[in-house]
Every structure is written in structure tokens, then in C-alpha cells.
Amino acid sequence: MAPRKGKVQKEEVQVQLGPQVLDGEKVFAVCHIYASYNDTFVHVTDLSGRETIVRITGGQKVKADRDESSPYAAMLAAQDVAEKCKSLGINCLHIKIRATGGNKTKTPGPGGQSALRALARAGMKIGRIEDVTPVPSDSTRRKGGRRGRRL
């Protein structure tokens, strides 16, 4: 038998995802926070909005359905998003916060504020904060009937 040849060592090339940047350089992305009364989405895209970088919801972070929209679930989701963004080299975010809108409520749910605060506390620099809730110019009829919702 012929003598065994030694294993050939393959060089492992470090693959770095995200943009190649210098230290201290600001790399922006857009964070779309959709805060309804049932769930909170924290969705980071590139500046054009076409390419999703990371998307995490409050429902992915908690077990109970009633806690999906809670500030705590939104905070956990935002912390995960910030961690993923930092690993990709993104250190600055423009924020677009959105409520359900249309002929439904135009105020963001309870998780919107805490998601924004969690992103800032996690070390992400905040660029612009914008409310992008869809507001109807003239809408379909709102739920509740002629005499409205009676409490």
C-alpha cells in the first residue's frame, strides 16, 4: 500500500456580510416599526426599502398571544434587531413608525414607543423619526354604525 497523504489544510476565508466601512463611519438603514394593538413588527431594510435586513415581531419573543403587542415584547424584538444590525455593520437607523391607519386607529400601539427606546438604548444612532401611518383622504365607512360605538 502507498503511504497516506496528509490532510490538505484549506484556508478559511472570513465572509463579512454588510457594507465594507471604516471605523467611525455611519452606515444607515431604515427601521420600519409597525405598532398595532395586536402585535409589533420591527423591520429593518436598506435605504431604498427593497432589501430586508432583519424582521422580528413581538409575537416571536413571547409565548402568550395577549403579550404580542406589549412593550416588553417590542423591547425584546428591538434588542434582537439592534444586535443583528451591529453584526452586519449597521450603526445608524432612520425610524419610520406606523399605526394601523386607514379607517382604523391612527395612534400607534403600546409597543411602538418602547421599541424605539430599546433601539436607542442598544447603542444604535437614530437619524430621522417619521410617522408614516396611512391617513385616508376619503375612506370607506368606518366600523360602528350610524350611532357609533356605545360604551
Curated annotation (Swiss-Prot):
Presence of keyword Aminoacyl-tRNA synthetase: no
UniProt feature, compositional bias: Basic residues: 142-151
Entry-linked SUPFAM superfamilies: Translational machinery components (SSF53137)
Keyword entries, A-Z: Ribonucleoprotein, Ribosomal protein
GO biological process terms held by the UniProt record: translation
Gene Ontology cellular component list: ribonucleoprotein complex; ribosome
Top-rank taxon, per record: Eukaryota
Record region (Disordered): 129-151
Any one GO molecular function term: structural constituent of ribosome
Family matches, as NCBIfam families: PRK09607.1
Protein family (similarity comment): Belongs to the universal ribosomal protein uS11 family.
Annotated PANTHER family: 40S RIBOSOMAL PROTEIN S14/30S RIBOSOMAL PROTEIN S11 (PTHR11759)
The protein's name: Small ribosomal subunit protein uS11
Source species: Procambarus clarkii
